[in-house]
Swiss-Prot record:
GO terms for cellular component: cytosolic large ribosomal subunit. InterPro entries: Ribosomal_bL19 (IPR001857), Ribosomal_bL19_sf (IPR038657), Translation_prot_SH3-like_sf (IPR008991). The gene is rplS. Belongs to the bacterial ribosomal protein bL19 family. This is Large ribosomal subunit protein bL19. Keywords: Ribonucleoprotein, Ribosomal protein. It comes from Wolbachia pipientis subsp. Culex pipiens (strain wPip).
Length: 125
């Protein structure tokens, strides 16, 4: 039974696979997704900090937090959702935790995350 379920999940992942950039919690993301309203369908952009990432096969998801008009908004997106159009990494963040739920309580400068810098090693002659 579980083997059949695993095969089904693998088929669905292959069918719904999208090109997704590599990102981690702490990164600034720009998520584009479709919203269905009473008037029709429109595209919305949600830009904020990734506070968690959950890798569970077909049920993989990630949470993004942004501050709008002084209120903290956390939105969860499913990786294999047909409503998800694209994800862009705007900035890499330097954090030492996998889940950044403590950021939901912080505002302003306290909620800032340092940028992760990568260095290129020069070849010696």
């Amino acid at each position: 039974m579980t083997n059949l379920l695993e095969k089904f999940n693998e088929q669905q992942i292959q069918r719904l696979a999208k090109e997704m950039p590599a990102f981690c919690p702490g990164d600034d993301l720009k998520v584009t997704f479709k919203v269905v309203d009473s008037t029709g369908e429109r595209i919305q952009i949600f830009e904020g900090v990734c506070i968690s990432k959950r890798n569970r096969g077909l049920h993989s998801s990630f949470s993004v937090r942004k501050v709008s008009h002084g209120e903290s908004i956390v939105s969860q997106f499913f990786v294999y959702s047909p409503a998800l159009i694209s994800v862009q990494v705007m900035r890499k963040g330097k954090v030492r935790r996998a889940k950044l739920y403590y950021l939901c309580k912080l505002f302003g400068k306290a909620a800032r995350i340092k940028e992760r810098t990568t260095y290129v090693k020069k070849k010696s002659k």
